[in-house]
Amino acid sequence: MEMIGGDDTDTEMYGALVTAQSLRLRHLHHCRENQCTSVLVKYIQAPVHLVWSLVRRFDQPQKYKPFISRCTVNGDPEIGCLREVNVKSGLPATTSTERLEQLDDEEHILGINIIGGDHRLKNYSSILTVHPEMIDGRSGTMVMESFVVDVPQGNTKDDTCYFVESLIKCNLKSLACVSERLAAQDITNSIATFCNASNGYREKNHTETNL
């Protein structure tokens, strides 16, 4: 696509269009007739590097996913490796076997396939991306998570999408809470470090003056 002429508004609209198209390409799923797909977006008031540091930990999803009690990874957490996830009681599942399909630290992309477990999420594939975003004048993050999954026999596409979306919404809400709490701690620690350094500088000057 080529842009010719136009004012600043046209440029902004073109930039937004290119961004939207880029995001759609990253979240492109091949959805068969017996499957459903959807994409969810969450805005988080924490810098992208902090959010990504939580998301990328394929070996420790329980850091922010509230329904996971334990995770075991066979080997190093690299593309192609598997993890065994134990699900907390109260959900219609106890275990899930998942494979890491994508892990891009530059583009901030995480892709996962579920290949086994005692649940009904057959042929489940998800892609999660994080993107820098200004929120209320501060550096924040936009998180996008998309999925495709088989519709179980006896269920509708709407019912299946609603169930999976509910789980993802809970995960993203928890991700926001954990990220924003860590961001607040970073700010508090930075202020404390600055204050301590300032106090030390003043004490040093006071001592030198008395001498």
From Swiss-Prot:
Abscisate binds at residues 65, 93-98, 120-126, 145. One of its GO terms (molecular function) is abscisic acid binding. CDD domains: PYR_PYL_RCAR_like. A motif (Latch loop) lies at residues 119-121. The record marks 66, 112, 164, 167 as: Involved in ABA binding. The keyword 4Fe-4S does not apply. A motif (Gate loop) lies at residues 89-93. The record marks 92, 156 as: Involved in interactions with PP2Cs. Residues 29-180 are annotated as: START-like. One of its GO terms (cellular component) is nucleus. The keyword Lipoprotein does not apply. Belongs to the PYR/PYL/RCAR abscisic acid intracellular receptor family. Receptor for abscisic acid (ABA) required for ABA-mediated responses such as stomatal closure and germination inhibition. Inhibits the activity of group-A protein phosphatases type 2C (PP2Cs) when activated by ABA. Homodimer. Binds ABA on one subunit only. Binds to CARs protein in an ABA-independent manner, both at the plasma membrane and in the nucleus. Interacts with ABI1, and possibly with other PP2Cs. Upon interaction with ABA, the 'latch' and 'gate' loops change in conformation leading to a tight dimerization and the creation a surface that enables the receptor to dock into and inhibit the PP2C active site. This is Abscisic acid receptor PYL7. It comes from Arabidopsis thaliana (Mouse-ear cress).
